[in-house]
A protein has these predicted regions:
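Residue-level micro-sites within transmembrane alpha helices that shape
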Residues: 18, 31, 391-395
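Zymogen propeptides/activation segments of proteases
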Residues: 3, 36-363, 468
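Extracellular hydrolytic enzyme modules, especially secreted metalloproteases
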Residues: 321-323, 327-468
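A broad, structural surface signal
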Residues: 1, 294, 298, 388-396
């Protein structure tokens, strides 16, 4: 059966905030956004336990994101696995801009203090990382992305009066100038920028195709059914599979009922290689993952399983919104999963683009940008994935950048924005934060309110729908 308007999922959804009071505070923080399409989920903030080959238990932590990920001990010293011995050891510089294993084992959990003292006497640097990497076909750190990756992404969306009720008035410009926001420039899809300049719908109904990818070596693994994924993506209100609401609910709440994300779920597509292959030893941070994306899209198109025209409602020749969910555990959880795969041999959730060879359906609909997340939660069992990561990556698809720290020196805006802490206050991804007023302003979901010059009389508490 071809997925199209004749069998799409339709529901009457109501925002959990539609009858409640919401007060927004606009934080005056500066955000650097370089227009690249590569964005991703931050690492699991919780530490994890690994077992050394000799049975010793050690406590490690995954840091960063796909651009720049590294493993450290509880004190922040970089750890690598020795490929010869299999032991986790402290990293050291190799003299050529890279890292190599030292001979010092990571301090175990049951250490009496002697090993720790011996380790600290080495005067190691915390958060040690390679200074040189080949980023020509890989998601890398911020500076390397800026200088070496092609310009993939659309700029943050500019405002137009017919879309958001904002004109190029003094007040509108003041909104951006007061808070040191660089106003985004609108780019039409006709611009010569590999098709990435187009603007996504942020009001009304946004049709989202959800493609389920099963790695070749996962053919017999238990995974959520398409019907279960439909609950995760579309359900109205709490459900045992999505106890705090669905991904659709997240965007209804954040947009004050302005954006209705309508997701249509495919059956599982078994791709033509293994999880280990597509992860490529670096958490799927290289262009090898594009092979899986392309394979699944061609399979769906060649077998007439998806009406791609239906997902190009604005008829600009590009799919309106697309989500990929895979059959493995997310690399961003760190550690080793129940099947023995370390995080580097799993896929890290991210949003990127097929900028070398975009997919084009038989009817002429192009898929350039995509985002991908795990369908499973954690590192073991077959529990369905959660809304935090999918909502975060969908936010990127709408054009919002990451707002978390990427160099280990801080936490960015932290719990004040979905794009900074999609794990939520308890790390379970059931309670991802609301988007900040800054983000909602960029997406056209709030309208700035300016007090008049001079003295203003204001109520101690005032409700203003979709206002700052």
């Amino acid at each position: 059966m071809k997925l199209s308007k004749n069998n799409r999922h339709t529901r009457n959804h109501h925002s959990a905030l539609s009858n409640g009071a919401t007060v927004l505070f606009l934080l005056a923080f500066g955000v650097n956004y370089h227009g690249f399409a590569a964005n991703a989920m931050m690492a699991n903030p919780r530490p994890f336990t690994e077992t050394q080959p000799d049975g010793q238990l050690i406590r490690l932590r995954l840091n960063g994101d796909p651009y720049d990920a590294w493993t450290s001990d509880a004190d922040g010293y970089t750890v690598v696995r020795d490929p010869i011995t299999g032991f986790f050891v402290y990293a050291e510089e190799d003299g050529n801009g890279g890292l190599q294993p030292s001979h010092d084992l990571v301090v175990p959990l049951d250490d009496n203090g002697s090993r720790r003292l011996a380790s600290e006497s080495k005067n190691r640097k915390k958060h040690l990382r390679p200074s040189k990497r080949d980023c020509s076909q890989m998601i890398c750190g911020d500076n390397e992305r800026r200088s070496k990756l092609p310009l993939l992404g659309r700029n943050l969306r500019g405002y137009r009066s017919n879309d958001h009720g904002l004109n190029d008035t003094d007040d509108d410009l003041k909104t951006f100038n007061i808070f040191n926001i660089t106003r985004p420039q609108f780019q039409d899809s006709s611009d010569d920028d590999n098709g990435n300049g187009r603007r996504l719908r942020t009001t009304g109904t946004l049709r989202n195709l959800v493609v389920l990818l099963k790695w070749e070596d996962h053919a017999d693994r238990p995974v959520p059914s398409p019907q279960d994924i439909d609950v995760l993506m579309n359900h109205d209100g709490p459900h045992p599979l999505a106890p705090t609401g669905s991904v659709r609910t997240v965007f209804l709440e954040n947009s004050y009922d302005s954006l209705q994300l309508e997701s249509t779920i495919t059956d599982w597509v078994v791709v033509n290689n293994t999880e280990h292959y597509f992860a490529n030893g670096n958490g799927g941070r290289s262009s090898v993952i594009w092979e899986a994306i392309e394979y699944a899209l061609h399979y769906l198109d060649d077998n007439d399983l998806v009406d791609f025209d239906y997902f190009d409602e604005d008829q600009d020749g590009q799919i309106d919104c697309i989500t990929f969910l895979h059959s493995g555990y997310g690399a961003e959880f760190g550690g080793t999963d129940q099947y023995g795969a370390f995080w580097e041999d799993r896929l890290w959730s991210h949003k990127w683009a097929l900028y070398v060879d975009p997919f084009v359906s038989k009817s002429g609909v192009q898929v350039m940008e995509y985002h991908i997340s795990p369908s499973l939660w954690g590192r073991s069992n077959s529990k369905i994935g959660r809304i935090g990561v999918i909502a975060h990556e969908t936010g990127h698809f709408l054009g919002v950048p990451d707002l978390y720290d990427i160099d280990g020196g801080g936490i960015g805006v932290g719990c004040f924005d979905l794009m900074a802490n999609s794990w939520g206050f308890d790390g379970r991804q059931y309670y991802p934060p609301q988007m900040s007023a800054w983000t909602k302003l960029l997406l056209g979901w709030v309208v700035p309110y300016f007090p008049s010059p001079g003295e203003n009389q204001i109520a101690a508490f005032q409700l203003r729908d979709a206002s700052l």
